[in-house]
Amino acid sequence: MKLLSVLALSATATSVLGASIPVDARAEKFLIELAPGETRWVTEEEKWELKRKGQDFFDITDEEVGFTAAVAQPAIAYPTSIRHANAVNAMIATLSKENMQRDLTKLSSFQTAYYKVDFGKQSATWLQEQVQAAINTAGANRYGAKVASFRHNFAQHSIIATIPGRSPEVVVVGAHQDSINQRSPMTGRAPGADDNGSGSVTILEALRGVLRDQTILQGKAANTIEFHWYAGEEAGLLGSQAIFANYKQTGKKVKGMLNQDMTGYIKGMVDKGLKVSFGIITDNVNANLTKFVRMVITKYCSIPTIDTRCGYACSDHASANRNGYPSAMVAESPIDLLDPHLHTDSDNISYLDFDHMIEHAKLIVGFVTELAK
């Protein structure tokens, strides 16, 4: 997630395993894109130095030489009125802060969810098990709902849960699951409670809510629904890039993608005397889809919005956008008031507000239902 001025408040991180990054890993070079058409070969340490300075990027090392720029997006007509209020409100009533607190307590207990190490693989495996349990508990597996790993050339895998609809066109909700200790990426403690354990468990709870609707559960919604948990976001949007590039190559149609990156920290707004609000990202997103998201928030959520800019390649919605798919992102706050503990060993659950996370879950349920049903 984008750092910007939050970096100035970051706590000192601690390395607990005592090992250093191997010399050959430091010497390895990666091709990154910092802005459209602006590329650079860097070492891994140079990647983290850019991140520490608040500079985000796509890691495009695995793309073919001569990669293409962002693909033009097709014009998609989004609903201009609310159509499923009764169904959405019934699902919202089932959302549980206790579920999210339980899930996030476990997810942030892993030493780290860094994408290159075994802990990151373990956290992804545990998370996928929770997704499978949600599908099975709802009985959605009997109607074709499933969860699958999306493998990469590093330890952590991405996760895709699919609820079939009458059309193969997909409505996507995504969140990255990896964490990082920027002082010591390979070995440092990185609980990642807010960045992005909060987003991961928020969309998991929203999945549980969506599966309460029998029309959706039984595969009778107009469109297919997918929930994504991306690996390797902190290293340059690796997991989401791979998934949306695959979708582009295979011709998959995506009606819209909503990204949830950090959903739980409100203290920055409170300390500034601001009303607790969503941060609506306005750059590198689809304007029409974002307008639809605003309508959903107005109808189903109890907090207002503040417009904010996130920058190029700041989170996984940018991967959808770059591959020609309309995307939107809603953050926990304006970008300059994000959780100052992100990317450190202090990104703990104690700083988060689960009522705020429930508001994000309401948004997701409304977004998915109004767009897919």
Curated annotation (Swiss-Prot):
Enzyme Commission code(s) on record: 3.4.11.-
CDD domains given in the database record: M28_AAP
Activity regulation info: Activity is inhibited by EDTA, o-phenanthroline, bestatin and amastatin.
Cofactor note: Binds 2 Zn(2+) ions per subunit.
Induction data: Expression is strongly increased during growth on protein-rich medium. Expressed at even higher levels when keratin is present in the protein-rich medium.
SUPFAM superfamilies the record matches: Zn-dependent exopeptidases
InterPro entries: M28_fam (IPR045175), Peptidase_M28 (IPR007484)
Domain of life: Eukaryota
Keywords: Aminopeptidase, Disulfide bond, Glycoprotein, Hydrolase, Metal-binding, Protease, Secreted, Signal, Virulence, Zinc
Complex and partners: Monomer.
PANTHER family: AMINOPEPTIDASE YDR415C-RELATED, METALLOPEPTIDASE M28 FAMILY MEMBER
Family under the similarity heading: Belongs to the peptidase M28 family. M28E subfamily.
Protein's recorded name: Leucine aminopeptidase 1
